[in-house]
C-alpha cells in the first residue's frame, strides 16, 4: 500500500479517491444485498480470491489470514441465508464486508495494476450498481430513493427466477472474472482497463436485453 502512495500523484487527491473507493464499495455491497445468498456467496468468492493473491511464498500473512477468515465466515453464514433465508445479514454485515474487501484490496496491492485487478474481484456488484445509478440519472430520478432496478432484482421479482439460481450465477460469473483478472495483472494498465471495459459492456448488454424484454412484455399487457 505504501508503494501506491509514492508514485507521483498529488497525495490529497489520491487519499480522496481511495476514501471514495472504500466508502463506495461499502455502500455498493450493502445495496446489492437484496436476495437470499448473494452477499454471502459473493463474500466467499471475493475474499477467497484475495486470499489466493495475498499468499506470499507459501507463508500465511496478515491480509491472507483476514481474507481467509472473512471467506470462512461467509461460508458459515450461508446455510442460514441460502437457499431460503432464515437469518439476514443486514446493513451492518454487508457494509462490513464491503469495507473489509476494499481495505484488503489496497493492503495486498503493490501497484495500480493490482488495485484494478483485485477490485475487479467484486465486478458483478460494481457493474450492477453502476448501471442502476446511470439508469436513474438518465430518468432524472433521485438517487436517495430506494428502488428495485438492479439486474438481480429484476430477475428475481419480474422474471421470478429463484434467488439461489441468481446468487449462484453471480458467484460463478464473479469467480471467472476474478481468475481472468489474476492472469491479466501483469499485462499493463491499458490491457486491464480494456478488459474491464469489455466485461462491463457485456454485462450492460445482458442488463439491457432483460430489461428491454420486460418493457415489451409490460407494453403488450397494457
Give the ranges of each region predicted by the language model.
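Membrane-interfacial amphipathic/re-entrant helices at transmembrane-helix boundaries
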Residues: 1-20, 52-68
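Helix-capping/transition residues at the boundaries of transmembrane alpha-helices
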Residues: 29-30, 106
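Function-critical hydrophobic alpha-helical transmembrane segments in multi-pass membrane proteins
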Residues: 13-29, 38-39
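Alpha-helical transmembrane segments
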Residues: 39-222
Amino acid at each position: 500500500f505504501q508503494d501506491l502512495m509514492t508514485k507521483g500523484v498529488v497525495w490529497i487527491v489520491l487519499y480522496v479517491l481511495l476514501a471514495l473507493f472504500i466508502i463506495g464499495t461499502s455502500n455498493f455491497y450493502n445495496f446489492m444485498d437484496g436476495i437470499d445468498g448473494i452477499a454471502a456467496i459473493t463474500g466467499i468468492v471475493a475474499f477467497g480470491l484475495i486470499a489466493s493473491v495475498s499468499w506470499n511464498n507459501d507463508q500465511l500473512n496478515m491480509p491472507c489470514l483476514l481474507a481467509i477468515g472473512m471467506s470462512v465466515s461467509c461460508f458459515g453464514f450461508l446455510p442460514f441465508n441460502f437457499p431460503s433465508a432464515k437469518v439476514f445479514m443486514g446493513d451492518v454485515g454487508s457494509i462490513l464486508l464491503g469495507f473489509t474487501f476494499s481495505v484488503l484490496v489496497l493492503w495486498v496491492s503493490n501497484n495500480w495494476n493490482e488495485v484494478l485487478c483485485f477490485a475487479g474481484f467484486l465486478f458483478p456488484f460494481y457493474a450492477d450498481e453502476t448501471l442502476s445509478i446511470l439508469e436513474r440519472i438518465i430518468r432524472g430520478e433521485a438517487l436517495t430513493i430506494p428502488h428495485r432496478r438492479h439486474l438481480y432484482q429484476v430477475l428475481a421479482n419480474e422474471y421470478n427466477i429463484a434467488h439461489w439460481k441468481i446468487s449462484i450465477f453471480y458467484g460463478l460469473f464473479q469467480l471467472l472474472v476474478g481468475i481472468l483478472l489474476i492472469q491479466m495483472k501483469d499485462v499493463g494498465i491499458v490491457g486491464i482497463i480494456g478488459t474491464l471495459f469489455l466485461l462491463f459492456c457485456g454485462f450492460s448488454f445482458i442488463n439491457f436485453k432483460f430489461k428491454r424484454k420486460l418493457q415489451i412484455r409490460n407494453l403488450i399487457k397494457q
